[in-house]
Each structure stands twice: as structure tokens, then as C-alpha cells.
């Protein structure tokens, strides 16, 4: 994501986007992307998640504790 792109403009998030949004480490983000129930997909070796799937996942897991 370049400096002029905002979250509102993105429709697909990368590992780095999720790291920044959730304020988690790269290691934690990779564990999350590889966990069951996290609706991500791969393009080649790169992990991605759609904005709508990410928002739905966040809302449906509100209040839950994750050990990643």
C-alpha cells in the first residue's frame, strides 16, 4: 500500500495491512492467516483477505480471545 492509499480505498488486504490494522507482529499475522476459520486466500505464495471478509470475521469474533 502506498502512502496515499487509505483503508477505505482497499478491497483486498495483505499481511502487512492486517498487521497494521490489528497492531500485531508479522509472526502473529502469519499464524492468523494460516488458522482455521480465518477467511484468507493465496495468490501464489502471498496471503490476502477481502475487506468484507475481514470485517465480517472481526465482527463475528468480537470479544473472543485468540492465542496466536
Regions found by a protein language model. Give the residues of each.
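Short intrinsically disordered terminal tails
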Residues: 1-5, 65-68
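Polyanion-binding surface elements
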Residues: 2-28
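A short, Lys/Arg-enriched interface patch at domain edges and termini
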Residues: 54-68
